[in-house]
Amino acid sequence: MKFSHSLQFNSVPEWSTKYLAYSQLKKLIYSLQKDKLYSNNKHHVVEPHDANDENLPLLADASPDDQFYISKFVAALNQELKKIDKFYISQETGLIANYNELKDDVMELENTNKATQLFNQQQQHQLQSVARNRKSKSQQRQRRFSSVSSTDSNPSLTDMSIDSAPVIHTQVSNTTNNGNSMQNLASASVSLSNSNPVYLSPFTQHRLSLKKRLISIYTQLSELKDFIELNQTGFSKICKKFDKSLNTNLKQNYLNYIKFHSHVFNPATINRIQHHITETILTYASLNKGTRRPSNTFNLDADRINNDENSSGNEEDEDGNRQEVLDFQDAERELSSHLRDHVVWERNTVWKDMMNLERKYQSAKTDNKKFSKLSSSQLRPNANITESMAMSSGGAGIIAPSTDSLTFRELMHLPPKQWLQFIMGQTSLLKFLLITSCFIALLTFNLTPFTQDSLQKNCFAILIYASLLWATETIPLFVTSLMIPLLIVVFPVIKDPITSQPMSPRDSSQFILSTMWSSVIMLLLGGFTLAAALSKYNIAKVLSTHILASAGTNPHFILLTNMFVALFVSMWVSNVAAPVLCYSIVQPLLRTLPRNCSYAKALILGIALASNIGGMSSPIASPQNIFSIGIMDPSPSWAEWFMIALPVCFICVMAIWVLLIITFPPEPNVKILQLHPSRDPFTLKQWFVTLVCIITIVLWCLSNQISGIFGEMGIISIIPIVVFFGTGLLTSDDFNNFMWTIVVLAMGGTTLGKAVSSSGLLSTMAQLIKAQVEHEPIFIIVLIFGLVILVMATFVSHTVAAMIIVPLMSEIGSNLPSGDHSRLLIVIAALLCSSAMGLPTSGFPNVTAISMIDEVGDRYLTVGTFITRGVPASLLSYAAIVTVGYGILKVMGF
């Protein structure tokens, strides 16, 4: 929610330089913040020109160390205030002059209307006297004259659109004292109305002209009012940012100061503008209805539109007041339609921030594909000779277009060498064709030990095909997940549980599609909803800031505190979203660090690695946990998961913290900014969101005890979704911003697991592996498979590794001679998937960390930084899981 964006889109374009220079003041705040951190404040003395007599009250409550920075900032604020005040006075002066001129014209129109009605009454009286003598003829004459007279006396009968009406600049003047002029005006109206019924009388034209001028005045008054409010909001927000950054209390004092030391922000000024706006609406309502207004139209107060308590007993007065209110609302609505739309900025959810970060990262990436480097002259035999000469002349030439513009006919005429260059440049296509060839070979030839059962043979081919596509990311991960149901139905895999015969394509499709939407998916959406609500209403950030504010300024302790905050946030908003939130919290700290500072690297890497560890901490902390819990039977309760995961997470974070301190030695000249908690009290919405989140988490923790009411945890997840989206706290845009690629990825993994289990392939593979390890102790099995899982999860995503390995671990563990240890192996596998963090692509936190850049656009981290710290961190976590985690699981009877 950036005010600079609101200022940009809601300001009047012609006045863009006259608004508060919000961005420049932000830069000044950051400069003063850094100066305060690295300078000896005791040597700063407030100079007389920095603090005049008017500014002294603003410095009264400040400490001597802060007075220098407050005086510098106040001087910049006063300069902006003077600029805004001067511009406003110049605009107000001209606008009020136009307003008064319009006031006189409206009063003149009212006087003209009165004189016209008086003239019509006199004419009617004369016609009535003549009618007594010539009754038949006078009746016809009276009807004709009455028709014309009513048209003139009630201009609303010739109502038409303001925009389509002609603009008449002729002013009707001196009509009150000149009876001949009024007689001529009425006579002209009569004759012209009879000869041309669509002709507008001068009176009506003048009324429409006044309505146009009222629209213009209303628009300018509204823009002037918005100018005041927008700048007032800007001063409030920039002072709040200054107080937050330098730990001062300037905001309230300065806002009170500008009310009495400027014309633009004086309450009387704002009331005057609002009064003029209300009177303009009242006058427009009168002209719009064509009714007669009293001569003091512009002296009426806005309260006139409300019901008068003194006339409550008179029904006619009440009806009249009610009609005036309706007329006022209609006029206000019509006038407001001519205003520009006001853009309101809401705080983003963490999922929207992730989309923006990914979009920024994707737009910054350069196209590394080789075929894009081929010039047009290389691919096209008839390339433009001018382009070839430009490229060969040693000049810059024209950048060659990519092969996206290459036609099929041109491709067919390429020489063999250029054909080869073109084909070799399509790396993704080549990988896809190679993997697809392997898939076809597995389907066609007997290359596997599963040839005796065609269903298992097909399922193994699909498993290898999907695993290779996931591992290489030849196509997007979610696209591979969507391919799985198609392959399962086309190549028979699903076995009827009763007859053990292959299901028909119709039954197979119904079964496999029904497995895609499960309790796992609902639990995932429930976690996304909690993360969206906690981030949109700033709750997670406020709580995290309060924790970090108590960390002091010791670099080592701040690093450890940030890592535990990342762990804590990951528990409730998932480790997919936690890094984005944590990096926004430490942004002020990173801004004050020198360039290429090793502590900045340690801080960013520490948050990423701790977020990976945080993926173990709760059932909703990561997609792999949700997927693993869905396979376990019975599923562990939240309390059981916490008892297993939290001790392991604590040990892993402490070990990684020591690793970062050793590999990133502290720099003596680096000073750490003291973070300050938010001073804003919790609103009712924030308390409501917090209460709903707590209730949801408590119900999840008690899911086994209340399974007779809610069934599975996925049903409980519907509660926050209905509450937050049903009440409007979250919108449909927030729902659209969910990480749907992760949801589809989880669907694909669930579908593949069902297929592998239904075909019997999982049982056959487990029997083959069990024959090799069944005589080994369970601890040795954990060590062996733990390394395999760690390596696989390092090179593919954590979620994909879990979807491939966890079903196999479940089947192997359930058939061991020592007993059913499937739940133990599943939990170990899930924890190890989160502990793989050796590469920038190993997990969502690492991807977020590698995309972090400083203020000049340089990346904080490199691939080498991840490998040299991530691999040892993975091994330390592996050791903690297979020892401490294994021991806790054995004690708990898993």
Swiss-Prot record:
Matching InterPro entries: Cit_transptr-like_dom (IPR004680), SPX_dom (IPR004331)
A Pfam family the protein falls into: CitMHS
Organism from which the protein derives: Saccharomyces cerevisiae (strain ATCC 204508 / S288c)
GO cellular component: fungal-type vacuole membrane; plasma membrane; vacuole-mitochondrion membrane contact site
Source organism, top-level taxon: Eukaryota
Note: Present with 4280 molecules/cell in log phase SD medium.
Protein name: Low-affinity phosphate transporter PHO91
Maturation and modification: Ubiquitinated by RSP5. RSP5-mediated ubiquitination initiates internalization and degradation by the endocytic pathway.
